[in-house]
């Protein structure tokens, strides 16, 4: 698959999947950014729906719908979707580019070896490293959008959630320090292991269950891509959930935490070890659905794009041939 083709199909598919489950993503973020009442600050200014703690995602979605209507469930969706598109475009672009370059280099290094059987594929560790490299690059581009999106999701009023107001509030609260828009970057960089685990797991599972199609996701059916996406995302989410919770706490409205270690230590001391996996069920639900849809959409988009390129090439060649005949 071409690098640009991979980036475009991956980005479009991820944006479509994000829109499909956005209310769940919104509720999940709010749940993860909640703190226990006993340790709340004296002032509730900027907190998520002051004096309210949601029991679960369903309770959160119902109450948001009652108070804000259907649009309340899509608060901050525009920025989140743009951030998702950009992050995945950059990720898939660099992942495909780095992986192809690495495999080319590896293949050249093995050309001198004789009796090599079967295709050359990266090991699980190599897939993880390649994924981390690509995800780290994407984090640098999209961290500010993630900060704005999380703030939009966790403020109470629709007025405060407006894009320009969020930008102004973050800038003012940090005394003009522009690095505040990269708050949580360290956690984000640590979380690059999440998509790395996801895509490494996807590649390994694809080789195990669909060995004949291991080099092309576009050759799998939408159902096959969906199942592999679900399984691979479940693995990565369970491993990295504490960091996901810490990132939500760092970037939420009214957050007083400055590092993910501080946020995790606070949770452990005040709410116990179990709280480090707070919201893991909605995170898993959202994650596996999005990842499943992403791989399914991406596979179908890849097939559609190839068909369009083929039709365009056929039309161009036919039209060009007719012009040459006419000129003679």
Curated annotation (Swiss-Prot):
Example GO BP: proton transmembrane transport
Keyword list, A-Z: Hydrogen ion transport, Ion transport, Membrane, Peroxisome, Repeat, Transmembrane, Transmembrane helix, Transport
GO cellular component: cytoplasm; peroxisomal membrane
Keyword Transferase: no
GO function terms (MF aspect): adenine nucleotide transmembrane transporter activity; ADP transmembrane transporter activity; ATP transmembrane transporter activity
TM regions (residue ranges): 1-21, 78-98, 128-148, 185-202, 226-246, 277-297
Conditions for induction: Induced by oleic acid, through its ORE-like (oleate responsive element) promoter element and the PIP2-OAF1 transcription factors.
Solcar repeats: 1-101, 122-208, 220-304
Location relative to the cell: Peroxisome membrane
Subcellular location, principal: membrane
Family matches, as Pfam families: Mito_carr (PF00153)
Membrane topology: Multi-pass membrane protein
Record's miscellaneous remark: Present with 2250 molecules/cell in log phase SD medium.
Function according to Swiss-Prot or TrEMBL: Adenine nucleotide transporter involved in the uniport of ATP and adenine nucleotide hetero-exchange transport between the cytosol and the peroxisomal lumen. This transport is accompanied by a proton transport from the peroxisomal lumen to the cytosol. Transport of ATP into the peroxisome is required for beta-oxidation of medium-chain fatty acids. Required for growth on medium-chain fatty acids, pH gradient formation in peroxisomes and for normal peroxisome proliferation.
Family to which this protein belongs: Belongs to the mitochondrial carrier (TC 2.A.29) family.
Name of this protein: Peroxisomal adenine nucleotide transporter 1
């Amino acid at each position: 698959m071409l690098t640009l083709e991979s980036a475009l199909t991956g980005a479009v598919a991820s944006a479509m999947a994000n829109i499909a489950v956005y209310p769940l993503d919104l509720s999940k973020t709010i749940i993860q950014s909640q703190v226990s009442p006993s340790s709340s600050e004296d002032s509730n200014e900027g907190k998520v729906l002051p004096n309210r703690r949601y029991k679960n995602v369903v309770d959160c979605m119902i109450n948001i719908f009652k108070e804000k209507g259907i649009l309340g469930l899509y608060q901050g969706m525009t920025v989140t979707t743009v951030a998702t598109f950009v992050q995945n475009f950059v990720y898939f672009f660099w992942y495909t580019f780095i992986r192809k370059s690495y495999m080319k280099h590896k293949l050249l290094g093995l050309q001198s070896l004789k009796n090599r059987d079967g295709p050359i594929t990266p090991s699980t560790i190599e897939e993880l490293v390649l994924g981390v490299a690509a995800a780290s690059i994407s984090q640098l581009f999209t961290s500010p959008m993630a900060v704005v999106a999380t703030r939009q999701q966790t403020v109470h009023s629709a007025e405060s959630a407006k894009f320009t107001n969020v930008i102004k509030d973050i800038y003012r609260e940090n005394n003009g320090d522009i690095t505040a828009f990269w708050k949580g970057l360290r956690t984000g960089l640590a979380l690059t292991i999440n998509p790395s685990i996801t895509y490494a797991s996807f590649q390994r599972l694809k080789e195990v269950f669909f060995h004949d199609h291991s080099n092309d996701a576009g050759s799998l059916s939408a159902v096959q891509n969906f199942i592999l996406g679900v399984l691979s995302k479940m693995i990565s989410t369970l491993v990295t959930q504490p960091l996901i919770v810490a990132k939500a706490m760092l970037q939420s409205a009214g957050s007083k935490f400055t590092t993910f270690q501080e946020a995790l230590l606070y949770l452990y001391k005040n709410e116990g070890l179990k709280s480090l996996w707070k919201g893991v069920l909605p995170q898993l639900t959202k994650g596996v659905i999005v990842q499943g849809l992403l791989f399914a959409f991406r596979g179908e988009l890849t097939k559609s794009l190839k068909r369009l390129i083929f039709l365009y090439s056929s039309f161009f060649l036919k039209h060009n041939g007719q012009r040459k005949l006419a000129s003679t």
